[in-house]
Amino acid sequence: MAAPLSVEVEFGGGAELLFDGVKKHQVTLPGQEEPWDIRSLLVWIKKNLLKERPELFIQGDSVRPGILVLVNDADWELLGELDYQLQDQDSVLFISTLHGG
């Protein structure tokens, strides 16, 4: 069984508005059978942090196009995207690159 993880989850570029305007969240992910990955983190975020309009953040089992995801300041595309296995003390940043005009 995977141990609980302490992870910093941060939202920027307007994405924080979907989370009551709170940019940084220090969260403890509970222990579970499978290791935590970005895919399971997104499910947890949707259930526990997302306050409104989930369609602006989640599309299918991933983030919507236009949301940049950084894990420890590295582009998640270099780390395996949804399959990246989270480590204790990781920092995951979601930045919306879509803005109204």
From Swiss-Prot:
Keyword tRNA-binding attached: no
Cross-referenced InterPro entries: Beta-grasp_dom_sf (IPR012675), Mopterin_synth/thiamin_S_b (IPR016155), Urm1 (IPR015221)
SUPFAM superfamilies, per database record: MoaD/ThiS (SSF54285)
Pathway field: tRNA modification; 5-methoxycarbonylmethyl-2-thiouridine-tRNA biosynthesis
Cellular component, GO annotation: cytosol; nucleus
GO biological process terms, semicolon-separated: protein urmylation; tRNA thio-modification; tRNA wobble uridine modification
Cell compartment(s), UniProt: Cytoplasm
Modification(s) after translation: C-terminal thiocarboxylation occurs in 2 steps, it is first acyl-adenylated (-COAMP) via the hesA/moeB/thiF part of MOCS3, then thiocarboxylated (-COSH) via the rhodanese domain of MOCS3.
Domain of life: Eukaryota
GO MF terms, alphabetically ordered: protein tag activity
Predominant place of localization: cytoplasm
Residue(s) carrying 1-thioglycine: 101
A Pfam family of this chain: Urm1
Numbered residues of crosslink Glycyl lysine isopeptide (Gly-Lys) (interchain with K-? in acceptor proteins): 101
Keyword line: Cytoplasm, Isopeptide bond, tRNA processing, Ubl conjugation pathway
First and last residue of the signal peptide: none
Family according to the record: Belongs to the URM1 family.
Function, as annotated: Acts as a sulfur carrier required for 2-thiolation of mcm(5)S(2)U at tRNA wobble positions of cytosolic tRNA(Lys), tRNA(Glu) and tRNA(Gln). Serves as sulfur donor in tRNA 2-thiolation reaction by being thiocarboxylated (-COSH) at its C-terminus by MOCS3. The sulfur is then transferred to tRNA to form 2-thiolation of mcm(5)S(2)U. Also acts as a ubiquitin-like protein (UBL) that is covalently conjugated via an isopeptide bond to lysine residues of target proteins such as MOCS3, ATPBD3, CTU2, USP15 and CAS.
PANTHER family in the record: RURM1 PROTEIN
Subunit structure comment from the entry: Component of a complex at least composed of URM1, CTU2/NCS2 and CTU1/ATPBD3.
Protein name, per record: Ubiquitin-related modifier 1
Native source organism of the sequence: Bos taurus
Record gene name: URM1
